[in-house]
């Protein structure tokens, strides 16, 4: 994978000022972003998150998922610590794209769960790839993370690229009546570590 650094700039946010680093995957043409705060290249494990793009949750305030809540929670945690990094990866809809995500939502409106909808459309349950994270983190001088995630697949992916996950930091945010079944499905079918509440619901949904 050929991921190259393009440019960096300051990015003031409600949580504090980050540095925004832009990267281009020359093979796919996708543009990825890293937001960093503080000295993250000192060798110590860095509080971090891999966040896949979710237009509906991150920008349109959707309550169907927990993505927007996790994005805000991760940025707030980094700002509170004064040091950390968030990789914003252009992998909308767990890798199936925005329009296919809307198609999946339509199937979910008809009774399918989030995994069943993907499969009915001919996709895998989760088509994301995290190979771009290695060159992005290498450019930033990061080799060890305290990873904010509920997804064990992200931990395994990073470790397969020789990035140390020194700690998994739970990021359980945004449970509501609209996403309760969605989160239960992620726990029951995708192995996300969301606590006994979601696991129990997944087993009975």
UniProtKB/Swiss-Prot annotation:
Gene: ribA
GO BP term (any one): riboflavin biosynthetic process
Family the entry assigns: Belongs to the GTP cyclohydrolase II family.
Pathway: Cofactor biosynthesis; riboflavin biosynthesis; 5-amino-6-(D-ribitylamino)uracil from GTP: step 1/4
Catalyses which reaction(s): GTP + 4 H2O = 2,5-diamino-6-hydroxy-4-(5-phosphoribosylamino)-pyrimidine + formate + 2 phosphate + 3 H(+)
Catalytic site positions: 126 (proton acceptor), 128 (nucleophile)
Pfam families (alphabetical): GTP_cyclohydro2
Name of the featured protein: GTP cyclohydrolase-2
EC number, as in UniProt: 3.5.4.25
Positions of Zn(2+) binding: 54, 65, 67
Cofactor: Zn(2+)
Source organism phylogeny: Bacteria, Pseudomonadati, Pseudomonadota, Gammaproteobacteria, Pseudomonadales
Textual note on the cofactor: Binds 1 zinc ion per subunit.
Transmembrane segments: none
Cited InterPro entries: GTP_cyclohydro_II, RibA, RibA-like_sf
Primary role: Catalyzes the conversion of GTP to 2,5-diamino-6-ribosylamino-4(3H)-pyrimidinone 5'-phosphate (DARP), formate and pyrophosphate.
Residues annotated for GTP binding in this entry: 49-53, 70, 92-94, 114, 149, 154
Keywords from the named record: GTP-binding, Hydrolase, Metal-binding, Nucleotide-binding, Riboflavin biosynthesis, Zinc
GO molecular function: GTP binding; GTP cyclohydrolase II activity; zinc ion binding
Any one GO CC term of the record: cytosol
Organism name: Pseudomonas aeruginosa (strain ATCC 15692 / DSM 22644 / CIP 104116 / JCM 14847 / LMG 12228 / 1C / PRS 101 / PAO1)
């Amino acid at each position: 994978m050929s991921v190259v650094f393009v440019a960096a700039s300051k990015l003031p946010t409600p949580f504090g000022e980050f540095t925004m680093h832009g990267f281009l995957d020359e093979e796919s043409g996708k543009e990825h972003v890293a937001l960093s705060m503080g000295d993250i290249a000192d060798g110590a494990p860095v509080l971090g998150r891999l966040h896949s793009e979710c237009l509906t949750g991150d920008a349109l305030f959707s309550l169907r998922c927990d993505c927007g809540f996790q994005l805000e929670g991760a940025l707030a945690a980094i700002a509170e610590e004064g040091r950390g990094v968030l990789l914003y990866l252009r992998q909308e809809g767990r890798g199936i794209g925005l329009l296919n995500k809307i198609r999946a939502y339509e199937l979910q409106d008809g009774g399918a769960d989030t995994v069943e909808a993907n499969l009915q459309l001919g996709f895998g349950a989760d088509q994301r790839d995290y190979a771009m994270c290695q060159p992005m983190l290498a450019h930033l001088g990061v080799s060890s993370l305290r990873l904010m995630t509920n997804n064990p697949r992200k931990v395994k992916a990073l470790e397969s690229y020789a990035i140390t996950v020194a700690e998994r930091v739970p990021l359980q945010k945004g449970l509501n009546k609209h996403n309760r079944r969605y989160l239960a499905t992620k726990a029951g079918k995708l192995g996300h570590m969301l606590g006994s509440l979601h696991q129990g619901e997944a087993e009975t949904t």
